[in-house]
Amino acid sequence: MATQDADIIIIGAGITGCALGAALGRQGRKVLVLERDMSEPDRIVGELLQPGGIEALEKIGIADAVEGIDGQWTSGYQIFYGDSNVSVPYPSKPNGGAYQGIGFHYGRFVMNLRKALTSTPNVTVTEATVNELLRDETGEVITGVVTSSKKSESPVEYKAPLTIVCDGCFSKFRKAFIDHPIQVTDHFLGLILTNPDYIAPGRGHVILSKVAPMVLYPISSTEARILINYPGKNLPPMETLKKYVLESCVPNMPEKLRPSLKAAVYNDRLRSMPNQFLPPTVNRTKGMILVGDSNNMRHPLTGGGMTVCFHDAYLLSRFISPSAVPDLLDYERILNQMNKFHWKRKGYSFVINVLSIALYKLFTPKNRYMKALESGCIDYFKRGGNCVEGPIRLLGGLDHSPSHLIGHFYAVCLYGIYQYVLSGPALLMPVRIIESLLIFLQASLVIIPYILSEMSS
């Protein structure tokens, strides 16, 4: 076995790995990035970047990765609920103009990130599969990795004081270091619509149909991605899924969008992705850090995953910078920094993680009390002002305040209760007042377990 050295080994040249590698290389660290497959990836998620994620890219210095890929700037969302719809625009910037998100093909974006990575000083990128983590004689310290590749007949060892695992949502190294079980809540079915007839051009479309929530956003000048919720942990055969889209989803979406979705079922490949939730874990292993989706995942309904990953990359690079950790063999110092990093990241990760699951629960109501909350949420947005700007700042990754999230959530709850009590005949008002307690309880059961999960992890 041959040995090659670096200051830091990064496993995975995806969203987090590329951003982190670029940030560390610019600090003067000698970085080796190992990626199993350097060809353009093809996924149905990770195609919408919120304004907060763009801000994180700017801090790292690689914001130009969104350019030259036919990405489409978005100004917010249009939410469709029954026969009505409500506009949820991104807020204005302090110095003028408005914040924007951007939609793109995931693979094109990753290839741009890899270009930024490979052009960064002090960074080496190697195509190889990491099969094993090396440990020292005590078994307590990770000292490097063992890889295989098409270019080498025998395994190759790479050693470094610090190994950072960024191998994504299907991480093969996670299980040995994280005790939390991964929750699979449901699935997204993905299709690409060609030249759809947008109702609100330049905005993401959130369709709260009777069947399931659907999210649609542009990913090129001629294409839009639609993600359709399919409940349950297991999927039926593909023909059943196509029938579900054609017979249940198409009739329950805005009429202008129906032809393009119907055509996509016949012309595009219907793909699926499990929606997973994993609370974060403090890194306590000497010589190794888990970061990105390998450590923390949230529901993709709100499109906040990449925003969390880019903020993680930026923040982690600061916590292990040469000024913060001069000696990468000083494991106690690194572990202390990891504890600080874990709690510092709570601002943005708490908000995006909890909001993702809260909105998913609200927009897939299982009973009439949850339906009242869903309706209350839409009516809350319709009030305008801070009732719409506050939530979109949270969703867009621009507001990192957990208290603001909890405040808006319970404001939605109380407004939904208010609407519910007044919507029935006067004779039933006493009954509805009693039922309002059940609505409040349902709302609390939605959000409190995830708040506790975030704060205890």
UniProtKB/Swiss-Prot annotation:
Q: Which GO terms describe its cellular component?
A: cytoplasm; endoplasmic reticulum; endoplasmic reticulum membrane; vacuolar membrane
Instruction: Enumerate the residues binding FAD.
Output: 15-16, 35-36, 43, 114, 130, 293, 306
Query: What is the membrane topology here?
Result: Multi-pass membrane protein
The prosthetic group or cofactor this protein requires is: FAD
> For this UniProt entry, which segments traverse the membrane?
347-364, 409-429, 433-453
Question: How is this protein induced?
Answer: Expression is anaerobically up-regulated via the sterol regulatory element binding protein sre1. Expression is reduced in cells deleted for the translation-related genes tif302, rpl2501, and rpl31, rps2402, rps2801, rps1002, rps1601, rps1802, rps1901, and rpl1602; or the transcription-related genes spt7, spt20 and elp2.
Keyword DNA-binding attached: no
> Catalyzes what?
squalene + reduced [NADPH--hemoprotein reductase] + O2 = (S)-2,3-epoxysqualene + oxidized [NADPH--hemoprotein reductase] + H2O + H(+)
Pathway(s) of this molecule: Terpene metabolism; lanosterol biosynthesis; lanosterol from farnesyl diphosphate: step 2/3; Steroid metabolism; ergosterol biosynthesis
Q: Where in the cell is it found?
A: Microsome membrane; Endoplasmic reticulum membrane; Vacuole membrane
- Kindly state which keywords UniProt assigns to this record, in alphabetical order: Endoplasmic reticulum, FAD, Flavoprotein, Membrane, Microsome, Oxidoreductase, Transmembrane, Transmembrane helix, Vacuole
Q: Describe the function of this protein.
A: Squalene epoxidase; part of the third module of ergosterol biosynthesis pathway that includes by the late steps of the pathway. Erg1 catalyzes the epoxidation of squalene into 2,3-epoxysqualene. The third module or late pathway involves the ergosterol synthesis itself through consecutive reactions that mainly occur in the endoplasmic reticulum (ER) membrane. Firstly, the squalene synthase erg9 catalyzes the condensation of 2 farnesyl pyrophosphate moieties to form squalene, which is the precursor of all steroids.
This one is known as: Squalene epoxidase erg1
